Amino acid sequence: PAQPFRIKKRQGPFERP
């Protein structure tokens, strides 16, 4: 995927609101 950190909020140590 292009944004593996935007698929689910709070999915890791990078909580990005």
Swiss-Prot record:
**Similarity section:** Belongs to the 2S seed storage albumins family.
**Keyword Disulfide bond annotated:** yes
Q: Which GO terms describe its biological process?
A: defense response to Gram-negative bacterium; defense response to Gram-positive bacterium; negative regulation of cell population proliferation; negative regulation of translation
What are the disulphide bonds in this sequence?
none
Q: What is the lineage of its organism?
A: Eukaryota, Viridiplantae, Streptophyta, Embryophyta, Tracheophyta
Record flagged with keyword Lipid biosynthesis: no
**Any GO MF annotation of the entry:** serine-type endopeptidase inhibitor activity
Supply the source organism for this entry.
Brassica oleracea var. alboglabra
Q: How does it assemble?
A: The mature protein consists of a small and a large chain linked by disulfide bonds.
Task: State the protein's purpose.
Answer: Inhibits cell-free protein synthesis. Inhibits trypsin and chymotrypsin. Does not inhibit ribonuclease of protease activity. Has antibacterial activity against Gram-negative bacterium P.fluorescens, and the Gram-positive bacteria B.subtilis, B.cereus, B.megaterium and M.phlei. No antibacterial activity against the Gram-positive bacterium S.aureus or the Gram-negative bacteria E.coli, E.aerogenes, P.aeruginosa and P.vulgaris. Inhibits the proliferation of leukemia cells in vitro.
Please give the name of this protein: Napin-like polypeptide
What's in the keyword line of the UniProt record? Answer: Antibiotic, Antimicrobial, Cleavage on pair of basic residues, Disulfide bond, Protein synthesis inhibitor
